[in-house]
Amino acid sequence: MKTLLVMAGGTGGHIFPGIAVAEALRAKGWRIVWMGNPDGMEARIVPSRGYDTAWVRFGALRGKGLVRKLLLPVNLLVGFWQALGQLRRIKPDVVLGMGGYITFPGGMMAALLGWPLVLHEQNSVAGLANRVLAGVADRVLSGFPSVLKKAGWVGNPVREDIASVAAPAARFAGRSGPLNVLVVGGSLGAAVLNDTVPKALARIPLEFRPQVVHQAGEKQIDALRAAYAAAGVEGDLRPFIQDMAAAYAGADLVICRAGALTVAELAAVGVASLLVPFPHAVDDHQTGNARFLAEHGGAYLLPQNELDAERLAGILASLDRPQLLQMAEHARAQAKPRATEAVARACEELAEGRKA
């Protein structure tokens, strides 16, 4: 039985693509071990998947403050030492880095000890850990084109139920009436969307007003309900959406942030979007993610500092379904539906090469 060590953590944008690849290889009989931070999001998500875990306490490489800078060498040494111990214990056939700070100590130690290392960079701007590790990795892959010098563009792995949604033309057939708009704030919500969308809807005459499904995040659902009530508009307001594939499939337009996984899902489904990048993302990578779809005609890119109720209302009022169908098809044309397979295949090839 071959063993894959997945290194990923910090955000769902790193964790869920890693799970997609892990599941593909587990289905082929591989043993999966996950290296992450016991205090990170991965500690809440990964164990329920049934993977073995290898915890390493390691946090941000960058940050402000004298204490953080002074402690960085110590944190690096501790992280390297813990990762080294885990690698020697696990003895993986291949190490897969899917992003997040946790990939740095594990990736460096894997390269030092000669274990095959595959890197996958999800964002349009490579993170610090992957920029360093790309120089020592055996295979470098990316979710967007031209991210790292020697990276092969394979796309971002998405869940099978999302990748298998019907094509835009089939979904749009027979639709009529108000536009169907899906607003996605993510697990934590996006306060600016929660505040602006109901105000924008109130500016659109009732007969032209879109029907809205608005996902707010658990902590912001009460504030969202109050915002819709104050604006005098209605919507299907939810703290979370269980079936994202169905939600995407039913939408004419999605309003959301521009995380790498979100952009990959929008392309995989083939759905028009209005992307409002999170302005404080590291290296402003969400703007780059959004620009990729926008430049190919699949999305509108609206910086947060340009977002207000009047501007959003004007955009929504100007859209029609044929236009959104065309955007959906442009988005779908940028999809990489075999991304999971491509990353898994890279792991298999390196494992076979090591065996030989």
From Swiss-Prot:
From the Swiss-Prot or TrEMBL record, state where the protein is found.
Cell inner membrane
Asked if the record carries the keyword Cell inner membrane, the reply is yes
Major subcellular location class: membrane
Q: Which GO terms describe its biological process?
A: carbohydrate metabolic process; cell division; cell wall organization; lipid glycosylation; peptidoglycan biosynthetic process; regulation of cell shape
Which pathway does it operate in? Cell wall biogenesis; peptidoglycan biosynthesis
Question: Which reactions are catalysed by this chain?
Answer: di-trans,octa-cis-undecaprenyl diphospho-N-acetyl-alpha-D-muramoyl-L-alanyl-D-glutamyl-meso-2,6-diaminopimeloyl-D-alanyl-D-alanine + UDP-N-acetyl-alpha-D-glucosamine = di-trans,octa-cis-undecaprenyl diphospho-[N-acetyl-alpha-D-glucosaminyl-(1->4)]-N-acetyl-alpha-D-muramoyl-L-alanyl-D-glutamyl-meso-2,6-diaminopimeloyl-D-alanyl-D-alanine + UDP + H(+)
- What is this protein's function per UniProt? Cell wall formation. Catalyzes the transfer of a GlcNAc subunit on undecaprenyl-pyrophosphoryl-MurNAc-pentapeptide (lipid intermediate I) to form undecaprenyl-pyrophosphoryl-MurNAc-(pentapeptide)GlcNAc (lipid intermediate II).
Q: Which family does it belong to?
A: Belongs to the glycosyltransferase 28 family. MurG subfamily.
Full protein name: UDP-N-acetylglucosamine--N-acetylmuramyl-(pentapeptide) pyrophosphoryl-undecaprenol N-acetylglucosamine transferase
The species this protein was found in: Azoarcus sp. (strain BH72)
Give the organism's phylogenetic lineage. Answer: Bacteria, Pseudomonadati, Pseudomonadota, Betaproteobacteria, Rhodocyclales
Q: Give me the gene this protein comes from.
A: murG
